[in-house]
UniProtKB/Swiss-Prot annotation:
It comes from Microcystis aeruginosa (strain NIES-843 / IAM M-2473). Binds 1 [4Fe-4S] cluster per subunit. Catalyzes the isomerization between 2-isopropylmalate and 3-isopropylmalate, via the formation of 2-isopropylmaleate. Belongs to the aconitase/IPM isomerase family. LeuC type 1 subfamily. This is 3-isopropylmalate dehydratase large subunit. The gene is leuC. The keyword Metal-binding applies. Keywords: 4Fe-4S, Amino-acid biosynthesis, Branched-chain amino acid biosynthesis, Iron, Iron-sulfur, Leucine biosynthesis, Lyase, Metal-binding. Its cofactor is [4Fe-4S] cluster. One of its GO terms (molecular function) is metal ion binding. PROSITE patterns: ACONITASE_1, ACONITASE_2.
Length: 466
């Protein structure tokens, strides 16, 4: 058999059949559901008299709309309470494992599945959420899906999908101090564009990626979708296996599992549809200035002028200048910040909070800034508190919250007001993304968010290191 990529091997292993349309009917090994995209799917099942085919292959939690301050039931928001009750009823009726608030396992769906060992190499994973690509960090093929597809997976445990091309995205060399996985992925999206990955799965590789921890790899794969790729993945290795070993759902026959995981790695002579290579040493602490994740620059660069951009990017740039109220040619560094948020499925894990605490320790949040830290899961919160990270944040003037999606999106009480501008460790800076029709979002690493909170403006985090 000819050399194949991991994507080819996993796709082939999960192919049920090729449909008359040319699409593949693909078996889904793990289905993750939350309170926002599942109620309609369960309703459609009931309307058709269908049942959940494999309840144990679905895992449910609540994350998008849960408040991160007052979690007393019933919630103050009637719609939020209604949606939480709906998923509680649906999982009970269909015998689906559920991690609710206070269970010790609740959290952002893309945080809790990896930390419990549910996400494993060689899996196909689906979830009604764009950032399901996160799970590709383990060598899984993971897709975000729509509500009708959530229904399909619940009813059949399969999806009808067109096979993607594969682009190998290599990053080689050593990262400079103060440069993180978030900077790497923002740099990649800046260079390849928000539509550059359409029709592709991205295989992230190279010496830089190979040295990353699993949580850093999850940050990389989380934002594959922001570059247009339906999924992104990294070949599993010893770092992957060390992370998974001993977790709740790790395979009992460990040796056999590792042997299989080794066999699905991309062959050394696999042929890719495209290959791009980046030099890690050229990546700077990166911040977005516009209204797409591709509108990013190094923290010491100036906001691009229309003349400096390709003709194809000028229209969206003009839209961004107007919305963001930023001046072309002006430095991004020094931009005043109103709200600072560390959290999300991109950067709400324990390693993110440890790094944030390192920058916060011994400093105080600027008087005009509202700053808060939101752990990605109840487990992350418990671990952070065991390490005393919460006390560092509180002493520095940050708010310490309960687990949830929080200010990543405008579905819970954590929202921008008016034309406030936020420094955010999340993954999207679209217009109105954080709750205000005129609110503005600058994406950056947790370290840079903390630096911005302390200085009250966009700051090179390396200044705090020094």
């Amino acid at each position: 058999m000819s050399a194949r990529t991991l994507f080819d091997k996993v796709w082939d292993a999960h192919t049920v059949k090729i449909l008359p349309s040319g699409q593949t009917q693909l078996f889904i090994g793990l289905h993750l559901v939350h309170e926002v995209t599942s109620p309609q799917a369960f309703s459609m099942l009931r309307e058709r008299g269908l049942k959940v085919l494999f309840p144990r292959r679905t895992i449910a939690t609540v994350d998008h709309i849960v408040p991160t301050e007052n979690q007393a039931r019933p919630f103050l928001d009637d719609l939020a309470e209604e949606m939480i009750r709906a998923i509680e009823t649906n999982v009970q009726t269909n015998h689906i494992p559920f991690y609710g608030i206070g269970s010790g396992n609740q959290g952002i769906v893309h945080v809790i599945a990896p930390e419990q060992g549910l996400t494993q190499p060689g899996m196909t994973i689906a979830c009604g959420d764009s950032h399901t690509s996160t799970h590709g960090a383990f060598g899984a093929i993971a897709f975000g899906i729509g509500t009708s597809q959530v229904r399909d997976v619940l009813a059949t445990q399969t999806l009808s999908l067109s096979k993607l091309k594969v682009r190998r995205v290599e990053v080689n060399g050593d990262l400079n101090p103060g440069v993180y996985a978030k900077d790497v992925i923002l740099h990649i999206i800046r260079q390849l564009g928000v539509k550059g990955g359409v029709g592709y799965a991205y295989e992230y590789a190279g010496s830089t990626i190979e040295r990353m921890s699993m949580e850093e790899r999850m940050t990389i794969c989380n934002m594959a979708i922001e570059g247009g790729a339906r999924c992104g993945y990294i070949n599993p290795d010893q770092i992957t296996y060390d992370y998974l070993k001993g977790r709740d759902f790790a395979p009992k026959d460990w040796e056999s599992a590792v042997n299989w995981w080794e066999s699905i790695k991309s062959d050394a002579d696999a042929v890719y549809d495209d290959v791009v290579v980046f030099d890690a040493g050229e990546i700077e602490p990166t911040v977005t200035w516009g209204i797409t994740p591709g509108q990013g620059i190094g923290v010491n660069e100036v906001i691009p002028t229309p003349e400096s951009l390709p003709a194809s990017e000028r229209a969206i740039a003009e839209e961004a200048y107007q919305y963001m109220k930023l001046t072309p040619g002006a430095p991004i560094k020094g931009t005043k910040i109103d709200v600072c948020f560390v959290g999300s499925c991109t950067n709400g894990r324990i390693s993110d909070l440890r790094e944030a605490a390192k920058f916060a320790q011994g400093h105080r949040v600027a008087p005009h800034v509202k700053a808060f830290i939101v752990p990605g899961s109840e487990r992350v919160k418990k671990q952070a508190e065991a390490e005393g990270l919460d006390q560092i944040f509180l002493a520095s003037g940050f708010e310490w919250r309960e687990a949830g999606c929080s200010m990543c999106l405008a579905m819970n009480p954590d929202k921008l007001q008016g034309d406030q501008i936020s420094a955010s460790s999340s993954n999207r800076n679209f217009k109105g993304r954080q709750g205000s029709a005129s609110g503005r979002t600058l994406l950056m690493s947790p370290a840079m968010v903390v630096a911005a909170a302390i200085k009250g403006e966009v700051t090179d985090p390396r200044e705090l290191l020094n």
